[in-house]
Amino acid sequence: KTKYRIIGTHYTKHNKTFLAEHEEVVVSSNSFTYEDFLEVRYMSFMFFAVFQLSFQRWFFQFVRHLGIYPSKFFSHFFKPDRNSNWPERYISFIDTLKNAFEAELHETREDMVANAKKIFEANGNDVGDAVRLNLNYGGRLSYLENDWVKPVLLRHLNEIMNGKLSSEDRNLASLLIDLSEREQVDLKNICEKEPLNISFDVINWKKNKFMEPLHNLKMSEKLL
């Protein structure tokens, strides 16, 4: 089964003919379910958010050295146990993102073209905003969802580790989440942030592309 989606803002009218560049996307087959498609779409989003937008990059590099592949963590992140008590805004975010992934897909080419034409005419014969879900929602995740990110990441980490997460590793993971948040700058409300006490050389860790475990880079405690 396939569906259709517009590529960016590649649509216009030429000599009274409406044209729209698009993709035909395979969303299921005899060996690939629709749920598999959504799983791949979630992975694509998270890899972009972490490795292009640097969403919690310190944390994810750290847990990689705990033996947890990013794909495994991302899968847990998007499939929380709905019978457990999770932050409402977290559940709302992943549900909204899923709806956005599905809304960009159209059952037929004709539906896709009709939707693009509707947007074009509503904007006075001009294109609308580009559908850049990875960028838009990745930015939202990095800057607008901080109230739930830390407890959710730490809870998933503990669950993936089957309760065997040491207090030292939990504290370090928590510190690295705080470090990522300290790196963010609110240009509308610039204020001085409280420094972190850190006893691992994260600067050289990053410089060396996170090749070795952070535990190997112990140093005297410094303010960062």
Residue ranges, per PLM feature:
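C-terminal non-catalytic alpha-helical accessory regions
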Residues: 38-147
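Charge-dense, extended regions
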Residues: 113-224
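A structural motif corresponding to the C-terminal lobe/cap of the Radical SAM core domain
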Residues: 1-69, 195-203, 210-224
